[in-house]
Amino acid sequence: MSQILRKSKRKVNRSKRAKKGSHGIKVYKNTYVYIGKETSGGWSRDGIPAPKQEVVDRIIMRINTDKEIRKIMKHIKGITIKYAKTINRAGSWNGEKQWFEFVDHANIDVDDADEIIYHEIIGHAYWQWAKKWRNVEWTKFNEIANNMPPVNDYVAKYVDNKRDGRTDTDYENEQHSAIAELVMAGHSYHTKKGKVASDEQVDEMIKVWKEMHY
């Protein structure tokens, strides 16, 4: 009986720890990870290069070591890193599938990889996770972000998405990701040419953002 109990205990402990797979990313059991490989044939015959190794290494390092990402790893069900000849966007978070996708491209470097991770994972993925696990702080951030001008011109595209009395729209979500860029990188790669939030308003959003990211 004692041997059975010890065996059972070891099994439970292992299942609660994230482990590195052959891909090098520290994930929990049943998290799907795909890193694209080179396919032969050249562009004219649908051949595709593998993602640049330095970009892959940077993504792996961020996911494995960043404390903001480690908090929500159980929330991430899939990670895809691939290369494409042309792209509409280099990164995305699919909230329905809880899936992060990174698309490498000739013009993308390791700094771009950082910014995309900050925007998509520490921004969008964390915002979705916090709705359940940091709901008081999540609601407070959204109420303030909803009443503020957009952080940058990219967020301004979502102004029409704002709704009075609602704090769970794409506008607040994008405000959160924009603040994530500022907090993590010290700057945003999006412009501020239009009617955007003042420095004081951004500082107020940063304050409540940090309250949600304890």
Where are these regions (language model features)?
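Active-site-flanking segments in enzyme catalytic domains
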Residues: 28-59, 70-214
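Arg/Lys-rich, intrinsically disordered low-complexity tails that mediate electrostatic binding
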Residues: 1-24
